[in-house]
């Protein structure tokens, strides 16, 4: 009798496993998306006649605090100032004034190249002189923990910006980022203190 379709137990098992695999895949994808879903690559180039941009990481971040500092260079270097503001606590945005940087960028006054040479997470001894201040700030934001990441980098201004002789010109610099981990299940870090160059 051809009408009775025999579905073997094996077929049911295979079907069940396939669904399980799909569920796991979607779960992993959702978790990655929750993390931000964006992957950092070692080089970004925007070939634009008016506003060319270049960001290169000679060394890649090793963990989330270093990654947070890396996003700062990526977003700033590509002129994505709306993304920069996501890296900082809400109450610091006015002082950081990314809207002004965005306007300057569109007018051609901007840093057109960042080469990030390396990341170093400092030991407590290395930021001893700032520790009391960092502790107080981190506590005021309710962070679970914080790290201090030192970034060494080179920057190159646009020709138009150089005519205005910026305070920190072209060259090689280091900058410290105090990065705090927000309370909650998702591992989210914010830059709560942007060090002097």
Please tell me what each predicted stretch does.
Residues 1-44:
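Gram-positive cell-envelope targeting signals
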Residues 2-3, 64, 150, 182:
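Intrinsically disordered, low-complexity regions enriched in Ser/Pro/Gly/Gln/His and often acidic
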Residues 20, 70-77, 85, 89:
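Generic solvent-exposed, charged/amphipathic alpha-helical segments
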Residues 27, 69-70, 116, 149:
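Generic hydrophobic, helix-prone segments enriched in Leu/Val/Ile
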Residues 30-78:
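Short, low-complexity N-terminal intrinsically disordered segments enriched in polar/charged residues
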Residues 81-143, 156-161:
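Short solvent-exposed beta->alpha transition segments
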Residues 133-197:
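Exposed beta-sheet edge and beta->alpha loop/turn motif
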